[in-house]
Amino acid sequence: MNVKQPIRLGVNIDHVATIRQARHTPYPSVLHAAFVAEQAGAGGITAHLREDRRHIQDRDIELLREHIETRLNLEMAVTDEMVAIACRIHPHACCLVPERREELTTEGGLDVAGHLDRIGETCRRLGDAGIEVSLFIDPEPAQIEAAARAGAPVIELHTGRYADARNDQERSIELEKLRHAASVAEALGLQVNAGHGLTYANVGAICRIPQIVELNIGHAIVARAFFSGLKEAVADMVTLLHTARWG
């Protein structure tokens, strides 16, 4: 693995839509946010079309697919409705995630090993439509091996436990799990992405895992944008990723 390979930043713009949906106004524009993120160096745009439509709406996905210049990564649950939407809109990539209506945000990885047939069938349907499929999973070898059996070419490692670690010892343990998981995935021929809970303060160590190709980050960027502006917030994260990988 070439440690000099740059990391692609996928900017998750869900929380731009969260602000809009709080008042059900036409602003702020998700599409405008995506344009600004691209201008600042984002390598892709990520959006989660949840079953309850709490933030991103169907029309947002359609507009993003029609107009952005980079990659659209659609996060979605493993349901027939979402597969049909993905096959109609045809994003560059789909990341399959677990989903519960009562959760504030995605709380854990997919149980691929426990639902191998259903997830495998979804991977086949999306793959047959020419859509790259990734599976959002915890950094557990059994889940990574199941992802390979399901036919997904990409995994996204759930970094939430690392991000939520209460002290340096816990953080070190979770970081080692991520490093080992990335090595297991590489040995199985899988592309490794990662995300969830990553911030400007904790992303550096993740960048130094050489197998990681893409990081999807949203909340921290949108939060910083309140004070510095979205373009600067994205540019700061792009610079941080490159410095951590190459420095």
Swiss-Prot record:
Q: What CDD domains does the database record attribute to this sequence?
A: PNPsynthase
GO BP: pyridoxine biosynthetic process
Show the Pfam families listed in the entry. Answer: PdxJ
GO cellular component terms, alphabetically, are:
cytosol
Q: Where is this site: Transition state stabilizer?
A: E156
Is the keyword rRNA processing in the record? no
* Active site, per annotation: H48, E75, H196
Kindly state which reaction or reactions the protein catalyses.
3-amino-2-oxopropyl phosphate + 1-deoxy-D-xylulose 5-phosphate = pyridoxine 5'-phosphate + phosphate + 2 H2O + H(+)
Give the EC class as a word.
Answer: transferase
- What keywords does the record list, in alphabetical order? Cytoplasm, Pyridoxine biosynthesis, Transferase
The record's EC number reads 2.6.99.2
Q: Which positions bind 1-deoxy-D-xylulose 5-phosphate?
A: D14, H15, R50, H55, T105
The main location class comes to cytoplasm
The reply on keyword ATP-binding is no
The family database entries (InterPro entries) matched by this protein are listed as:
Aldolase_TIM, PyrdxlP_synth_PdxJ, Pyridoxine-5'_phos_synth
Q: Which residues form a coiled coil?
A: none
What is the protein's quaternary organization? Homooctamer; tetramer of dimers.
* NCBIfam families, A to Z: pdxJ, PRK05265.1-1, PRK05265.1-2, PRK05265.1-3, PRK05265.1-5
The protein's role, per its UniProt record: Catalyzes the complicated ring closure reaction between the two acyclic compounds 1-deoxy-D-xylulose-5-phosphate (DXP) and 3-amino-2-oxopropyl phosphate (1-amino-acetone-3-phosphate or AAP) to form pyridoxine 5'-phosphate (PNP) and inorganic phosphate.
**Name of the molecule in the record:** Pyridoxine 5'-phosphate synthase
Q: Give the source species.
A: Methylococcus capsulatus (strain ATCC 33009 / NCIMB 11132 / Bath)
Taxonomic lineage: Bacteria, Pseudomonadati, Pseudomonadota, Gammaproteobacteria, Methylococcales
